[in-house]
Every structure is written in structure tokens, then in C-alpha cells.
Amino acid sequence: MAKKTVRQQDFMKRKLKVGKPKQKPSNVTDTSFQMKRISLPSQTKISSGSNGKSAGNGTGVLDLNQEVIKRVSLLRHHSDVTRKETVLYFESMISRIIHLPSMNNLMQSSIPLMCDSSKQVRDELANLLDTIGKHDANVLKLQIRAITLYLNNAMTHIIAPIQRDSGMFVQVVLKYCADELVRHAWIKMLKGFFQVLGWTIVTQGNNKAKGKSISMGITSSSVLSMNKNKKHKNENLKAMLQFIRAGVLGAAAIGHEDRNPEQGNGANSVSPLLQQRYVPYMIPEFPQPYAYLKLFTRQFAKGELTSTGAETSSTDSGNMTLEELETLSCEDTHTRRMVFNQHFYPSIQRQLPALIKDGGECGRTAHSFSSTLEEILQITV
């Protein structure tokens, strides 16, 4: 009976008494007060920089370093306008933050923007990487593994605009760390270019794969999209041409100066034929020059183990499939040239005549491509 009475009280309409105000609900909030400032705990106030008084001491550098770390999170903002403005901000600050510890955080957060959905963000990222390379190319070289990973992601991306813009990033990277890129991902990058351009690879290997065309997984819609965008196709052709010249003919072949000014009369100032003869006997310019031998790694390709358990050292890459080529190290120019001539040269040669016949920017680039292929054949392996 008591519970029934309590329930009825909830539905009873209270009677208003004369001279008394209306009773307020129990959960009412008093809004009669005034505040002079509002606290936003989810946002951080960022200063305009360490100019003037604090720029000359360690406190200014520390503040600038913390400011960069706070701004880096905006590169993952849901708004493409915010991401673009953040990239523009970092581009204007590169000269001051290029040697700060927070530069590593910036690179790790900005490189994934190669696959960003916004065209404007990707364009500004290319300008940012170019600015970083102009100030200190070693920053890009230290991040070559991450750069290679996201370059391949962009080349194989399901969204056609992201795939088309991959050549833009390749050209920027080749300007400052061409040698590192070709040594690290020679075969993967070549396969990626074939996928971006919609070409097929005709294998020239063993009897099982002889005369077999391997599609690179390009859909008809992406090929039509690339054909409609002649400008992007030309940019990817240029990127592929520069990449092949850097890998087969040397870093100096792409038209950029050597990164070491003390070697002006060294390897990069002579012809590629002389370069390949004596460069292997010079002191290497990069760390771990013999890592391609895999002396301290246990990695064997399928079917390359003998009965004694030792790995066969066959240098004939023509008998290897495209899947087995992934395990082949391409640290030296000789191996890269051999792999290119046996697996990629015939497929490229089949595509160039049609491009030259079409004319235009793509035709001129294809003509330069054809001249480069003839130059590669003239080099005695």
C-alpha cells in the first residue's frame, strides 16, 4: 500500500498556493552567475614562437620543441583544412626546428599523409619534404624506411588520386636520397610504377613462366582515370625514368649534385662504365655496406637450400620469379642492372612506342625514356 501511494505522488499535479512562487524542479541549474573567462581543458594554448628575449637561451629552444610536439597531433585532425594549415605552419618553421629532437616526431606523423584523402594536404606535404631536404637531406635519409613503406602504400592504394600523386613524392625523395631509395626498395618500387601506370610485366625467366604476362592488379577504372589525366601520367613517367637512371646509371644521372662536395672529382663525375669498375673498391659512404650479404640473418628463399643446408649462391636472377625477387638484395649497381634488364626492360620497351606515337608531354618523356634504355644497353655488364 505504501509503494502505491509513492507512485501516485509522482503523477499528482501540485496545487499552486496564493502568494508563493512556482516550485522549481530538483535538478534545476542556476545560470544567474557570470564568468570572466572560459576554461577549455581539451585545447592547448600555443604561443607564437620563441622570438626576441628567449630566442638566445635554452629556454626558448625548449619552448619551441614543446610547441612542435603539441602541434604534431593536429596532423591527424579530422578536418583536412586543419591538416593543411598545420603542414604549412611546419613548412615555415623548418629553418628553426630542423635540428630539434621533435623533428623525429614531425617526420613520423607527416610521412603517412602521403595517403591522405585531401589533394591539397598531399601537395603541401610534398613541399614540406622538399623544404626539409633543402635544409638537411640527412633528415629524410634517416626516415627512408618509413618513406619507402608509404610510397608503396600510395602506389598500391585503392583510391586513384592518391595513386596518381605517388610519382610526385618519388621525385622529391630522389632529389635528396636517391641512392638510399634504390638500394632499399629497387624491385618493390619498379613493381609499384607498373601498377600506377597500368602496365603488365612479361616474365622472361624459366620455362614455367616464359612468355607469361603478370597483371599488377590494376582495375580498368583506374587505368581509364590515369589515361584521362595526362599530366599525372607524365609525372609518373618522369618519376620512373629518374628512379631507373638513379638505380642503373648512378645517382648523378638524375641531374642532381652529389651530396658530398669533397668528391667532386670522384665516382659521380665520370661515366657509369668507369664508375662501376672502381667504385666497389672505394670506402663506402653509407653504413652497413655489406648488409645485403645477410651474414647475420637467417632468411632463405624457397627452393634455394641444398641437401647440406647451405644456401646456394646463384647469381642468375633470370630463373627467379617476381615473388622470389623480393628476397634478392639490390645494394650494388650490377645487381640492379641485371634484374632490370631481365625482368622489367622488355615490358617497358613494349609500352614506349605507343606513348611516343601519341605525342605531347608523355611522348617527349617516353622518347627520353627510350634513349635511357639504349644507354643502359650500351653499358657492358
Swiss-Prot record:
Q: Where is the composition biased (Basic residues)?
A: 14-23
InterPro entries per record: ARM-type_fold, Ipi1_N
Keyword line:
Nucleus, Ribosome biogenesis, rRNA processing
Looking up Pfam families in the UniProt record yields:
Ipi1_N (PF12333)
Q: Where in the cell is it found?
A: Nucleus
Q: Where the protein is mainly located, per its record?
A: nucleus
Would the keyword Ribonucleoprotein turn up in this protein's UniProt record? no
What's any one GO cellular component for it? Answer: rixosome complex
The similarity annotation says: Belongs to the IPI1/TEX10 family.
Name of the protein described by the UniProt record: Pre-rRNA-processing protein IPI1
Origin species, per record, is Kluyveromyces lactis (strain ATCC 8585 / CBS 2359 / DSM 70799 / NBRC 1267 / NRRL Y-1140 / WM37) (Yeast)
Name the encoding gene, please.
IPI1
